[in-house]
UniProtKB/Swiss-Prot annotation:
Cofactor(s) recorded in Swiss-Prot or TrEMBL: FMNH2
Amino acids binding NADP(+): 40, 46
One record GO biological process: aromatic amino acid family biosynthetic process
Name of the protein in its database record: Chorismate synthase
Residue ranges, annotated region (Disordered): 98-120
Record Gene3D superfamilies: Chorismate synthase AroC
HAMAP family in the record: Chorismate_synth (MF_00300)
Keywords of this entry: Amino-acid biosynthesis, Aromatic amino acid biosynthesis, FAD, Flavoprotein, FMN, Lyase, NADP
Gene name, Swiss-Prot/TrEMBL: aroC
């Protein structure tokens, strides 16, 4: 069983991520993780923090000479700005009082759309600092690091590869008639400032981001993650909590600021008659079972069906808005403008990298549930044995 967990605060000394249940023999390096984290910092419309935020990575446990050991893998991502925050974020009690100004000024004006107010109520804080430190999207760096480990495992054990791109941002839609990107397009997508292969839409999206920046506003959008090479039969219809589509939806919705998710044609399928909403089964020229379309997004009955898995997520505009919204100062009870932490005009391109990591982690878990072994070699043999058990025309 694959399990993962993250720990750490946005301005704490470090983020820590751990993944347990990974087979022995997965090739992984510190450089792989550093490269993945660099992709998370890409994207037009990012704030000043991305310019100086560097990710210093250490593989602490579970890896020896570039190969996983089968024991828990722990990763540390150090905060290079920690010297500025040592007292404000000190784990130990201080022997002196800090002035309530600058970095230690009380954050008593919660931001609409953020975890601030409800977090303060839930945990009994009179300051939003403890809430925003953990609820910050900085935490996603941990998940991207773990997602890189999952990426290497999926590719090496199963030949599963993923890619993510932006399909809408700030109300600008990319052309749905363009071919879907493949993992071979990763370099081109990373080179795009808004992570799309649609050059016409790219220009219009950049214009929208510039407009939002001038207006001191923020923009949301829609991303899509595609998974290639997923064998049929991952997940199950037997119990609702073991359905693959349910797990993927949960993984995407667990990303900060995501408010919607769909598999395949999703909400569009709801407006079609049944005769135009499903993927007809045919025998192709090679005498094998095939499909005429992929409206289901590679998942039927809670199981992967062998086609490309398509998952989309909708991200709301970032609630840390330079043009601050109205709120209440919880210390005075008076109307006020919300606090404005350093933020981006949009983080949709970067969020696609996070979403890709979450899809990888979910697929790794479910693939291990089906084919798991103690080593990559054993896991691969289990997959090959499973596929060989099918009749020739069903492979």
């Amino acid at each position: 069983m694959l399990r993962w967990q993250t720990a750490g605060e946005s301005h704490g000394e470090a983020l820590v991520a751990m993944i347990e249940g990974l087979p022995a023999g997965v090739r992984i390096s510190t450089d792989d993780i550093v490269s993945a984290l660099a992709r998370r910092r890409l994207g037009y419309g990012r704030g000043a923090r991305m310019k100086f935020e560097q990710d210093k990575v250490r593989l602490l446990t579970g890896v020896r000479h570039g190969l996983t050991l089968g024991s828990p893998v722990a990763i540390e991502i150090a905060n290079t700005e920690w010297p500025k925050w040592t007292e404000v974020m000190s784990a130990d009690a201080l022997d002196h009082d800090l002035p309530r100004e600058g970095r230690n000024a009380p954050l008593s004006r919660p931001r609409p759309g953020h975890a601030d107010l409800t977090g303060m109520r839930k945990y009994g804080f009179d300051d939003a600092r403890p809430v925003l430190e953990r609820s910050s999207a900085r935490e996603t760096a941990s998940r991207v690091a773990l997602g890189e480990v999952a990426k290497q495992f999926l590719d090496q054990a199963f030949g599963i590869r993923t890619v993510a791109h932006v399909v809408a941002l700030g109300g600008v839609q990319t052309n749905p008639d363009l071919p879907l990107p493949t993992p071979d397009d990763l370099e081109a997508l990373d080179a795009s400032p808004v992570r799309t292969l649609d050059k016409e839409a790219e220009v219009r999206i950049i214009e929208r981001i510039n407009e939002a920046k001038k207006a001191a506003d923020t923009l949301g959008g829609v991303i899509e993650v595609l998974a290639y090479g997923v064998p049929a039969g991952i997940g199950t219809y037997v119990e609702s909590d073991r359905r693959l589509d349910a797990a993927l939806a949960s993984a995407i919705m667990g990303i900060q600021a995501f408010k919607g998710v769909e598999i395949g044609d999703g909400f569009l399928a709801a407006s079609r008659p049944g005769s135009q909403a499903h993927d007809e089964i045919v025998v192709n020229a090679d005498g094998r079972i095939d499909r005429l379309s992929n409206r289901a997004g590679g998942i039927e009955g809670g199981m992967s069906n062998g086609q490309v898995i398509r998952v989309r997520g909708a991200m709301k505009p970032i609630p840390s808005i330079p043009k601050a919204l109205r709120t209440v100062d919880v210390l005075t009870g008076e109307s006020a403008q919300a606090i404005n932490q350093r933020s981006d005009s949009t983080a949709v391109p970067a969020a696609s990298v996070v979403a890709e990591a979450m899809v990888r982690l979910t697929l790794a878990k479910y693939a291990l549930d089906k084919f798991g072994g103690d080593s990559v070699a054993e896991t691969r043999r289990n997959l090959e044995s499973y596929l060989a058990s099918w009749p020739e025309h069903m492979r």
